[in-house]
Amino acid sequence: MSRNLYALVVAATAIGLAASACSGSPNSATKATPSATATQLQSLIPTPANTQRTDGPDSIPDNGIHLHFLVNGSSTDVLDAYKTALEGKGWMVTVVSSGRWAGAGGATYTGTQGDTYGVFSGGGSASAADVSACAWPSKPSNPNCGGGNRR
């Protein structure tokens, strides 16, 4: 191969590599993933066993949703079972706080599932528990999910 032809092949290869690096790829790691819809978020939130009433989903800031469940059963048992149900739905769960007293108690969990972020909290008596569940397409700057003004 002549020196000029070799230089031309090297230049063409370099241009081809540069062009392919600049073109979009359907498998690009930097490709933006679409935000989850409220319906998709709701499908990620399990309904606790023995739920007697469900409120929501309600829209909350940062494209999130909030659900409230009133559940029959000891609040400590309800929240322990709910953590297991979240993990069964694919959530990576972190216990933020938990406490028990005379059959009553409460807990707050955070969770991630891919980019989706959730806050799950609840508490109550020895016979009933309130559970609030919130999910967002990605972690919001203020992941407020319960009590007070969520809007």
Give the role of each language-model region.
Residues 2-8, 15-18, 23-151:
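An acidic-aromatic pocket/loop used at catalytic or ligand-binding sites
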